[in-house]
Amino acid sequence: QSVASSTRSSNDQSKSPAKATQKPQTPEEITANKYDELISDYKDAIDDFSKVITFKQKWNGLALSRKERQDGTKTILINSSRAFEKSEIWCLNFDNKFFAFPGSTVKSNMAAYMNLDFEKAQRDFKGVFSITSGSSYSAEPSVLRRGGAGFVVERPGKLTFPQ
């Protein structure tokens, strides 16, 4: 009987290392992987216009624009009258959070935004993205929350234009 029980316990031990290598992902890991997928899909969409509609559908994209008259210290974004593919700001809903990214037209019209020391970019994205120059075009999303008739920028993102 002691031989049978020792065999059984060694079988149990041999199964546990296999489970350790296939442990389920934590909610944080799942969220991080999904966020990485969002960023990858975003980069594909801004580089290839034919992928924009699929991107919009997959990530529940909304076209936003800055509210014309801002009051106080908060920046408000409202629904844009432009189509998603033509809007300057894309809102994406992910993990019950809202993020604002520069739309594909921002990258394709980079020269206009960069003129006169980024005057157009500073004006159009004030309070939404800080504007900098760097080695290449890149964007970090703004964090939004629902508020009133639109969204409030909780944390501005960063928009980098090439030098």
Predicted regions and their residues:
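Long, compositionally biased intrinsically disordered regions
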Residues: 3, 14-17
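Extended, amphipathic alpha-helical stalk segments that mediate dimerization
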Residues: 96-163
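Heptad-repeat coiled-coil alpha-helices
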Residues: 1-9
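Charge-dense, E/K-rich amphipathic alpha-helical interfaces
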Residues: 17-115
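Short intrinsically disordered, low-complexity segments
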Residues: 8-11, 22
